[in-house]
């Protein structure tokens, strides 16, 4: 019996929707990364993108434990000398709530072209509205 290796053209991708209201950021991001990668499928192949599409709604209502709301910092650099910028979780959730989930999931995916392709299948929205009703996403409870 031979081991089955998935081919990119034979992969069947489903759409799932996750409501982030009251969910812990890290635990939810770990499950999202697991599903984007396709590790929950029996035909998982490390060098092929076998993951599903994930739509996350209510990103502004995600929570963190402890004092991370005030202490957790996100850093970016402008490219100019002395151009390092930092923003706390509290301020980032007010400014761009989808970026908190995107940053958490992106850090859990592989680096390189395959990881970037997996990340493109993640759709995050701050509110409860999303434009993916035509894909009929199934609700996923985490």
Swiss-Prot record:
Q: Does the keyword Ribonucleoprotein apply?
A: yes
Q: What is the species listed in this Swiss-Prot or TrEMBL entry?
A: Saccharophagus degradans (strain 2-40 / ATCC 43961 / DSM 17024)
Entry GO terms, CC: cytosolic large ribosomal subunit
* Gene Ontology annotations of biological process type: negative regulation of translation; translation
What protein is this chain from? Large ribosomal subunit protein uL13
Pfam families associated with the record? Ribosomal_L13
| NCBIfam families the UniProt entry points to | rplM_bact
Tell me, how does this one assemble?
Answer: Part of the 50S ribosomal subunit.
| Biological role | This protein is one of the early assembly proteins of the 50S ribosomal subunit, although it is not seen to bind rRNA by itself. It is important during the early stages of 50S assembly.
- Keywords from the named record: Ribonucleoprotein, Ribosomal protein
Q: Which GO terms describe its molecular function?
A: mRNA binding; structural constituent of ribosome
Determine if Electron transport is one of this entry's keywords.
no
């Amino acid at each position: 019996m031979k081991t089955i290796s998935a081919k990119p053209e034979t992969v069947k991708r489903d759409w799932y929707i996750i409501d982030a209201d009251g969910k812990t950021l890290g635990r939810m991001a770990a499950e999202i990364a697991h599903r984007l990668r396709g590790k929950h499928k029996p035909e998982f192949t490390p060098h092929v993108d076998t993951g599903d599409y994930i739509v996350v709604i209510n990103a502004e209502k995600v929570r963190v434990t402890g004092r991370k709301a005030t202490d957790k910092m996100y850093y970016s650099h402008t490219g100019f000398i002395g151009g390092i910028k930092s923003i706390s979780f509290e301020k980032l959730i007010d400014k761009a709530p989808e970026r908190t989930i995107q940053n958490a999931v992106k850090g859990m995916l592989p680096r390189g072209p395959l990881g970037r392709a997996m990340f493109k299948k993640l759709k995050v929205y701050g509110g409860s509205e999303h434009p993916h009703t035509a894909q009929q996403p199934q609700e996923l409870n985490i």
